[in-house]
């Protein structure tokens, strides 16, 4: 051992070949075919085949290490903020008008935005076009960005005009409530890349997407969804909406689902399975352009609240609710309030036995001239229809209701028609 130290101390020996040889000795046994000799006090490997073998093994080791690294790398987008950190929504700058989920490589001259879930660099983001375009990528060809919770993902980003979801993997997501809520300038969105097989909550998903004029929701699997509260509420620009493919068999809450969709002129909900719905408050309230609505398939046996169901639908002339079962409904507050053009209404099948609040039920239904009711019809408060001093109401026998009466007769099945006071005086 001392001789080796002395030799190293006294001889001019190149260290690299020695290190290489020692490394080879430890990692790979030197091949029997590899010959070495000294030249000018340097150790030389004579057999070139050995160096090629070493280099190939070294490459394999590096490849294996890279494979292990990639295997352990996750490609998951951060959602909820960790302590002292920001979530993805917070990292979307106000300058961004477009977000693109992609697999392309980040340009070297662009700064990295940390959007990775666990900080291993599997997902990166950067800005282009002076901050107008935000790209989010795994930088691995074909590798999608995984996300397990889409709740409020783009919420409140008023300047976004387009979102490309092509490389976003949502197969594990159970929450999409408020996903696009408040994207007031969003003009187009392709939902075909979304996997919603596991989603249970879509409440407020498109709420206040005021600039959307069309929306194809045929790609959405809603078979597990239980909550559709305000799902399309205040989508003021939507001119049409086809929801015929929706599986609503598990939905319990449809409160204000289409409320204030002010450009919708017709809505067909006949395919909806509402057998588990308990709350329909404001379902189509303030759909002010709505002229036609189909509710023929509705099963309302479990519904307890129909408050403001049709309120503010000022262009509806007819409403067919003959399929409704209201045996469990307690709240009908403002149910038809503001239906200014409604001329006839058949409530003969409506069960009023459990209704405790019917106030303002017919408020501002100024065109209503015929009302048909069943044997359980009653009112807990004064009826707006009977407050107009210019008109009176007659029953099917032609008998006028007393002038001082502000309620229709209780528990009497009948059809009432409105006539001007001057007509009755002339008679």
Task: Explain the meaning of each model-derived region.
Residues 1-6:
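Short, Lys/Arg-enriched N-terminal segments with co-localized hydrophobic residues
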């Amino acid at each position: 051992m001392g001789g080796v130290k002395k030799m190293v101390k006294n001889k001019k020996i190149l260290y690299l070949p020695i290190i290489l040889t020692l490394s080879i000795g430890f990692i790979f046994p030197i091949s029997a075919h590899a010959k070495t000799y000294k030249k000018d006090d340097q150790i030389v490997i004579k057999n070139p085949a050995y160096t090629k073998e070493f280099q190939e093994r070294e490459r394999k080791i590096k490849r294996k290490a890279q494979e292990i690294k990639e295997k352990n790398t996750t490609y998951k987008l951060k959602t909820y903020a960790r302590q002292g950190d920001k979530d993805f929504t917070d990292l979307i700058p106000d300058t961004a008008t477009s977000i693109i989920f992609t697999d392309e490589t980040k340009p070297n001259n662009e700064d990295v935005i940390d959007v990775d879930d666990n900080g291993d660099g599997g997902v990166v983001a950067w800005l282009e076009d002076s901050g107008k375009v935000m790209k989010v990528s795994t930088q691995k060809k074909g590798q999608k960005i995984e996300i397990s919770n889409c709740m409020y993902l783009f919420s409140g980003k008023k300047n976004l005009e387009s979102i490309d979801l092509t490389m976003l993997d949502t197969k594990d997501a159970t929450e999409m409530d408020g996903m696009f809520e408040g994207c007031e300038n969003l003009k187009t969105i392709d939902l075909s890349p979304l996997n919603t097989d596991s989603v249970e909550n879509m409440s407020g998903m498109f709420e206040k997407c005021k600039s959307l004029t069309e929306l194809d929701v045929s790609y959405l699997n809603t078979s597990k969804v239980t909550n559709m509260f305000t799902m399309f509420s205040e989508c003021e620009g939507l001119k049409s909406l086809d929801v015929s493919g929706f599986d609503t068999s598990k939905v319990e809450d449809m409160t204000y689902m289409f409320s204030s969709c002010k450009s919708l002129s017709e809505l067909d909900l006949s395919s909806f399975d509402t057998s588990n719905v308990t709350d329909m408050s404001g379902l189509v309230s303030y759909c002010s352009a709505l002229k036609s609505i189909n509710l023929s398939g509705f099963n309302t046996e479990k519904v307890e609240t129909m408050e403001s169901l049709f309120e503010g639908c000022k262009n509806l002339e007819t409403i067919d609710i003959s399929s409704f079962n209201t045996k469990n409904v307690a709240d009908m507050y403002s149910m038809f309030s503001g239906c200014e053009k409604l001329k006839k209404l058949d409530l003969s099948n409506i069960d009023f036995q459990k209704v405790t609040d019917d106030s303002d039920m017919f408020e501002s239904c100024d065109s209503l001239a015929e009302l048909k009711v069943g044997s359980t019809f009653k009112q807990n408060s004064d009826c707006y229809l009977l407050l107009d001093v210019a008109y009176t109401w007659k029953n099917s026998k032609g008998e006028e209701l007393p002038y001082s009466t502000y309620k229709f007769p209780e528990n009497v099945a009948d059809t009432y028609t409105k006539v001007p006071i001057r007509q009755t005086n002339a008679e």
